[in-house]
Amino acid sequence: MEDIHIYILQLEKGKYYVGKTKEPEFRLNEHFNGDGSEWTRKFKPVSVLKLIPHCNAYDEDKYTLMMMEQHGIFNVRGGSFCELKLDDRCKFTINKMLRGATSSTKLDNF
């Protein structure tokens, strides 16, 4: 397993960013120094909420979706959802994924 870290940043104006890195200290410094993602350049980091070691490449999207569920899709970026402005198709996909993840529907056919 790769030594990937997932990090969650609290940003200005109630925004959040989820990222992944093999070099957490270096990458976090980039965000805090204005050299990070477009989202963290627009909304400056306030604090590191979580740093999660021993993750895999898929965990970034998982944590991004979890944060979107908690804080709203307009307030969180990360993983496959890094664009400053999400298009309608992307918003539809995110909402569908969130509904599917929280659905209590039985899977009787399986």
What are these regions (language model features)?
Residues 1-110:
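Structure-specific nucleic-acid interaction/processing domains
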